[in-house]
């Protein structure tokens, strides 16, 4: 049996652009793509923290160092520039693989610059004002 588990996430990124007239996908700064271990064409889920929208699309690798997170195509009806989002990839693994796997968590600032890398699914960075879900 295979389980679907979190492969990686880019946490609390700020959407820089949303355009209906682009071919559907999400364009992500190459630095973030590589830090999260994503590849072009990979399926990702996007959760909009600002408005609660959720969607699935695929990754297009954008220019490195830009901080760009661009929502393209029909998804631009759901997610707007300035919205905070979590971009997540998933993978399938056996029980043994799933228990040993450490996801790639990429924490970014308001300009989508990497501020921390980790593998704790529920880590709240010190000073972020966020709470860990482990303490509920």
UniProtKB/Swiss-Prot annotation:
Keywords: Autocatalytic cleavage, Cytoplasm, Decarboxylase, Lyase, Pantothenate biosynthesis, Pyruvate, Schiff base, Zymogen. GO terms for biological process: alanine biosynthetic process; pantothenate biosynthetic process. This is Aspartate 1-decarboxylase. The keyword Lyase applies. Pfam families: Asp_decarbox. Belongs to the PanD family. Gene3D superfamilies: 2.40.40.20. NCBIfam families: panD. The gene is panD. The modification Pyruvic acid (Ser) is found at residue 25. HAMAP family: PanD (MF_00446). It comes from Corynebacterium glutamicum (strain ATCC 13032 / DSM 20300 / JCM 1318 / BCRC 11384 / CCUG 27702 / LMG 3730 / NBRC 12168 / NCIMB 10025 / NRRL B-2784 / 534). GO terms for cellular component: cytosol. Substrate binds at residues 57, 73-75.
């Amino acid at each position: 049996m295979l389980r679907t588990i979190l492969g990686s996430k880019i946490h609390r990124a700020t959407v820089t652009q949303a355009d209906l007239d682009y071919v559907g996908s999400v364009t992500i700064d190459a630095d973030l793509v590589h830090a999260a271990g994503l590849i072009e064409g990979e399926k990702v889920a996007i959760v909009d923290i600002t408005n609660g929208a959720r969607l699935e699309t695929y990754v297009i690798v954008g220019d490195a160092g830009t901080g760009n997170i661009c929502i393209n195509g029909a998804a631009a009806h759901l997610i707007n520039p300035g919205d905070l989002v979590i971009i997540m990839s998933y993978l399938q693994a056996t029980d043994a693989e799933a228990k040993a796997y450490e996801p790639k968590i990429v924490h970014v600032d308001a300009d989508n610059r990497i501020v921390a890398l980790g593998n704790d699914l529920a880590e709240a960075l010190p000073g972020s004002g966020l709470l860990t879900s482990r303490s509920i």
